[in-house]
Amino acid sequence: MSDVELVKKMLRAVLQSSKHGVAMARLQGDYRALTGEMIPFRKFGHDTLESFLRSIPGVVRLERSITGEVMCFAGVCEETAHIAQLVARQKNVKKTGCSKLLNFQMRARTSHLFSHNVKPRLSLRQPSNMTHPGRGSVTSFYSTQRKLYSNDLPSSRAPAWQMNRKSPVPEKTSVVPSKINTNIKTPLKKTSGTAAQQKPVNRADVELVQGRIKQLLQKYSSGVWLSKIPQLYKSMFQEELHIIQEVEKWTHICTVEKPGSNNIVDRLVYPVLEPVPKASPVPVKSPCKQSPNTALLKQPTLTQKTTRTFRTLAINIPQSTPKPQTPLSPTSPNSTMIDFTLSETPKTQSLSPITPPSTPPAHQPLTTELKQKLRQLLNKYSQGLWAHGLPQLFQEAFGCAFPQYVLEDLSLLADTCMVEYPMPDNRKRAILYTLPCQVQTQPRSRPPPLVLPCTSNPHVPPLIIPTADFHSVFVIEINSTNNVVVRFAGGGYSKSLEVMEEEMQNFYNNIGAGLCLLSPKIGQLVAVASSDGAMLRAQVHQLSEDKVKVYFLDHGFFDLVSRKTLFQLRDQFMTLPFQATTCQLAGLEPFSTDPVVLKTLQSLAVGRSLLAEIVEREDTPLVVLYDTSENDDVNVTAMCLKALQDKSMENPLQVNSVYTNVCVTNVCSDGSVYCQLPSRGQAKLKDIMDKIEAHFISQLTWELLVSRPFCGKVCLAKYKGKWARAEIINLHGSHVLDILFLDLGLPASLEVSELREIPPIFLKELITIPPQAIKCLLEDLNVDRAVWPPEAVLWLRETVHNKAPSCMKIVKLDETRTVHIYLFCGNEAQDIHDSVNRQLASCPFWKQDVYANKINKASELFLPDAGEPSGSSPAPSNALTLPPQLNLPLVGQNMDVFVSVACHPGHFVLQPWQDLYKLVVLMGEMVLFYNKQEVTTVDIQKNNVYAAKIDNNWHRVLVKGLLTNGLVSVYELDYGKYELINYTQLQPLIEEFRQLPFQGISAQLADVKKEVWCEEASMVFRNHVEKKPLVAQIESVEEGEWPWERKISVYLVDTTQENKDIWIHNIMKEFLDEISRDA
């Protein structure tokens, strides 16, 4: 913790825990109680602690007390300049200069840790030049990767060799610059994922390879990824495949197919269909639907080895999985293929514990109807579907049972879907994905195009939808929720438009001044001179004697202009796509022209810069808009649905009124309770929900499966066996989400397959009913605590939650319409002294200082022994085992990484880029598990591993220390962040979540040595690496006693730019040299 940023953060936490300040003489002790270390002020170039504190006035404010003692107070932490002023400037700006106001990005939503859209992705391009001579890249080639990155992550381009390649496997020789002479290049070793150097082959070699390829494809008769063929070829024949680029030309041997999905750049290879005996089934027309039994009709040649190939993952497959399983094809490129060569003798072989027998059980083949239904489900759930959810989905969606034996042997689905095991320790948890050739999308209705078709106009490239899930937009006009005109902000969009419009202004004010357009035609593209001198691209829509109605193609509005302002639009100004585009608002389709919705959108969205979450990427994207200009995110869709509610269905609340027949539906951890009051809305809600129950019982719900979850969506979920209204409030990856039962005030976590759409015939009526759960606070118990003691929460739940009708008296309604009440058991208001409030206040566990007890209980654990060094890390005392150590490449080798935290070049945290999707699945499972658990008291011990709830996600953390106010300092073992949380947010980390290695790797930048990093250098470093995928070349590894103590030294390379490698250590060296010259 020698880093100045971490020290500042911990100092601020210590000082904020005391309103009356901390004496400087006591500050070191309080800091050590939190972090286990002293404040290292000498490392930052200060002789005394007071000198260091005075150098950081933004963190510490020093004052002298009446007695003369120096007191330390928390300094004012000023936030960055708010963008609200900029938003206000944009309110009514339409015509000119808009692009200049859009060159910023809206604050990303803090609730999204990672993208929930998980798509296949290639590994990062490896840099063409290494740092040290003789060291080569041995990074494996992963043909598909589940990408998970933060909202502002740039899209990494494909490797440079893929742009003009004929084969998915590269032919590339990496070179290394010498330290003495950069022009001396040495060829590197080839990696397992790249092709070897080209060597001449004769006709006999080609025929031999073709025969072997034919044998390989007989084994994978349902298809195999082209990028996996060299690996499979080597494992079968113990030879390298040097002419993989020729495979596509061997049409008599195989068929190569490009998948229908734009997200997959690999190709599927199928064997050429040969004539089969007459007794065989009807020939399969589509390779994608080929039966796996077809391969059994083809006898292997004598030269073929009996090889069994199994799908598995490389980490700790448990021994309790000897289930029969055949190869799953097409082989998923992100799965590791482990080959076991068996003897051809008939005697029984003892298989590896991780390897199930290859002979499937004698089950009847799956029917075509069942396979088709499964394909329908997987098309509905394009991001994958957990296999364990199939029985319930089949029963509810199709009214039929799903065979249990298929779940025990998923290889039977080889020709129907792809199977992936993201949790290496659990072979029963599999995700099914539709085959690329089977992807089917249902087209949505599109608004009319903004640009009139005109054959005489030159071609202008179409606007590319941003690849990130979140992007800043400027909302220009909303005619309906299905026709929202917006412009994208940032690089490649508003910035490029600004540059082009400046070039247009310079051109038409000089060379192009005489290019006036005397006879415009409808549909013609023109340049229009605005009143302030700007030149804008437009299209002619209507003509009159002296006026022309034009549509401004980059700014999305119509206007009448004089003929004298029209100019010919030159070709050099048609290379940039037109920036105004249309989108549709998700969740508001049934209310597309509702006056209430349009009025709400006018006030919340039109003329403002918002953050757009892209739910569906098409020519007209489906988006959710957020206003992130304030501290709290405002979901525009949710606000529009709220505006549709009929307020007359609410029970009017009045101070000093008594309400009977109250039902307490939820008790939160902060002591707030949700109550249902009798109202007209509650009676109508019960009537509609009864009809919905009958609808689901009488009809199949195939069309009502929720396939596109997003925050703010109102749908249905089951609570205690009955359907209830729910709003999606958070997403954890693509399979797990958080909801809020609107009429219960009860949050829950579940899988997306458990949600259902509201039947259309009930939708509009149901949306108008306000939420029936009212949030209330118990008067006299509003203590200064973010979280109540677990004992108090449990007592309150046992006393009033879902018990006999209660009674409440409202004593106050604050500005936020929060209701302060006295709650009574029974249906009559009694004396206040008999209220639940007073009963709880008199309980022993409420009166005692819970935080002090926690500290006293664990204080002995925080004090080091007499001879123990202050920096040592005692052994964790958890009885459960720790995960295995994360496997790293050898020194000098490369690995694809994602930088989750970057303090400065001396300390940052890496995550393995290829395994991020496993972490997302793990965290989703943790959300499902812990959010369903009751609040329990945990014996918190320093240097132990726990599960912690941080920002609505569950993390694996290491406890570093406790503060006297009940806050706990924890270190996120997968992300490398330090956080302060309430002690009640900690739970034991069960064995199931200890299988995946901790993903956070502490690192420092190689070849850059400096003891103390200035803030300017740290900011430069963060801007280049934080929240970005990079290639790391390992320079050294410093092992530790525990996984979180390991630290590596790496070179970082940014390969996201086209044909350019950016070495981060060179940037930092140049920056340090520049600072030295200035000094």
UniProtKB/Swiss-Prot annotation:
GO terms for biological process: lens fiber cell differentiation; lens morphogenesis in camera-type eye; P granule organization; piRNA processing; post-transcriptional regulation of gene expression; spermatogenesis. The lineage of its organism: Eukaryota, Metazoa, Chordata, Craniata, Vertebrata. Pfam families: OST-HTH, TUDOR. Residues 153-175 are annotated as: Disordered. This is Tudor domain-containing protein 7A. Component of specific cytoplasmic RNA granules involved in post-transcriptional regulation of specific genes: probably acts by binding to specific mRNAs and regulating their translation. Probably required during spermatogenesis. Required for structural integrity of granules in primordial germ cells (PGCs). It is found in: Cytoplasm. Induction: Down-regulated by miR-430 in somatic cells. Down-regulation is relieved by dnd that acts by protecting the 3'-UTR of tdrd7 from miR-430-mediated RNA deadenylation. GO terms for molecular function: mRNA binding. Keywords: Cytoplasm, Differentiation, Repeat, RNA-binding, Spermatogenesis. Gene3D superfamilies: 2.30.30.140, 2.40.50.90, LOTUS domain-like (3.30.420.610). SUPFAM superfamilies: Tudor/PWWP/MBT. Residues 519-576, 708-765 form the Tudor domain. InterPro entries: LOTUS-like, OST-HTH/LOTUS_dom, SNase_OB-fold_sf, TDRD7_LOTUS_3, Tudor, Tudor_domain_containing, Tudor_TDRD7_rpt2, Tudor_TDRD7_rpt3.
